[in-house]
């Protein structure tokens, strides 16, 4: 089974992955789920947390990881992605790919014969969000009816948060400047999932105070993400500051609200030092939880 986006998962499956991630966090070592299995790790862009967490996850589950960075692999350059997928499937048991285009993942999954995991692309970041869900749960947050507020650029993280929130019955509010909204496709999918379960809601707004009011979780990411290199920096610095998570914005949320950021953070831009280093910040727990969530994802794909 592939994991390209979260919308292919049912609620029970997401909850099971989180449950397994909790187990792996409490029982880090002594597993052989990936014994005699080799996992290819493809990285088209630099990575700290994703690379470390997947590499360690494979090893700590008893498997072998094969790291391939951009420039070390023919991925649509000098060889079609289809042929690369076919060849890699003869050598490895699964492919974990952090790529620039979602289409690359779709091609790897279509033409390869082994599971493909989206470790990040321009449209989605499902593994990150599974770690986020673990962080919410271990901080006593019940998913159903939880108000999750996202601030900043409508990027791959916001796309996947909408889907996760819809699956689990959250009330998700995405606060972005106009013309920086999340993907229309992901909005449509989220609304379909909300209708399917009859729970939760999705609101898009350009007013960060509306989003922050009585929120249980406040979430932000960098203002210029991997898909936004052509966006005007002067424009970003002019229209985004009101979406910064700072003490004033945080004060509008619930007293026990937590703050998340998938990192790396541009301190002083999308989030202040005071907040990211404050008692309500769970950012570094969130980063650690990438490891435990990746293990749960690997376990899941080899069981389905």
Curated annotation (Swiss-Prot):
Keywords: Amino-acid biosynthesis, Arginine biosynthesis, Cytoplasm, Transferase. GO terms for biological process: arginine biosynthetic process via ornithine; citrulline biosynthetic process; L-arginine biosynthetic process. It comes from the Archaea. Carbamoyl phosphate binds at residues 47-50, 98, 125-128, 262-263, 290. One of its GO terms (molecular function) is amino acid binding. It is an enzyme of class 2 (transferase). InterPro entries: Asp/Orn_carbamoyltranf_P-bd, Asp/Orn_carbamoylTrfase, Asp/Orn_carbamoylTrfase_sf, Asp_carbamoyltransf_Asp/Orn-bd, Orn/put_carbamltrans, OTCase_ArgI. It catalyses: carbamoyl phosphate + L-ornithine = L-citrulline + phosphate + H(+). Its main location: cytoplasm. It is found in: Cytoplasm. The keyword Phosphoprotein does not apply. Pathway: Amino-acid biosynthesis; L-arginine biosynthesis; L-arginine from L-ornithine and carbamoyl phosphate: step 1/3. L-ornithine binds at residues 156, 221, 225-226. Its EC number is 2.1.3.3. GO terms for cellular component: cytoplasm. Pfam families: OTCace, OTCace_N. Belongs to the aspartate/ornithine carbamoyltransferase superfamily. OTCase family. Reversibly catalyzes the transfer of the carbamoyl group from carbamoyl phosphate (CP) to the N(epsilon) atom of ornithine (ORN) to produce L-citrulline. HAMAP family: OTCase. PANTHER family: ORNITHINE CARBAMOYLTRANSFERASE, MITOCHONDRIAL, ORNITHINE TRANSCARBAMYLASE, MITOCHONDRIAL. This is Ornithine carbamoyltransferase. It comes from Methanococcus maripaludis (strain C7 / ATCC BAA-1331).
């Amino acid at each position: 089974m592939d994991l390209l986006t979260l919308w292919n998962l049912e609620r029970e499956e997401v909850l099971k992955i989180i449950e397994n991630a909790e187990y792996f966090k409490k029982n880090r070592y002594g597993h052989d789920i990936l014994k005699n299995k080799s996992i290819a790790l493809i990285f088209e862009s630099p990575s700290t947390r994703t690379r470390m967490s997947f590499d360690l996850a494979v090893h700590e589950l008893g498997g072998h990881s094969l790291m391939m960075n951009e420039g070390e692999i023919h991925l649509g350059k000098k060889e079609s992605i289809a042929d690369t997928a076919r060849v890699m499937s003869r050598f490895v048991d699964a492919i974990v790919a952090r790529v620039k285009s979602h289409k690359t993942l779709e091609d790897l999954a279509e033409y390869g014969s082994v599971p493909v995991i989206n470790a990040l692309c321009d449209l989605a970041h499902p593994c990150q969000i599974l770690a986020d869900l673990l962080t919410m749960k271990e901080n006593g947050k019940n998913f159903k009816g939880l108000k999750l507020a996202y601030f900043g650029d409508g990027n791959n993280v916001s796309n996947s948060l909408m889907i996760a929130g819809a699956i689990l019955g959250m009330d998700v509010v995405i606060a972005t400047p106009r013309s920086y909204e999340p993907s229309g496709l992901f909005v449509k999918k989220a609304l379909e999932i909300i209708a399917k379960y009859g729970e939760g809601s999705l609101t898009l707004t350009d007013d960060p105070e509306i989003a922050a009011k009585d929120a249980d979780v406040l979430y932000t990411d960098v203002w210029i993400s991997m898909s936004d290199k052509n966006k005007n920096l002067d424009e970003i610095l002019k229209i985004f500051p009101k979406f910064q998570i700072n003490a004033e914005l945080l004060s509008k949320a619930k007293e026990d609200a937590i703050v998340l950021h998938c990192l790396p953070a541009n301190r002083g831009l999308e989030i202040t030092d005071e907040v990211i280093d404050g008692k309500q910040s769970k950012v570094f727990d969130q980063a650690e939880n990438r490891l435990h969530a990746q293990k749960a994802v690997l376990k899941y794909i080899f069981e389905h």
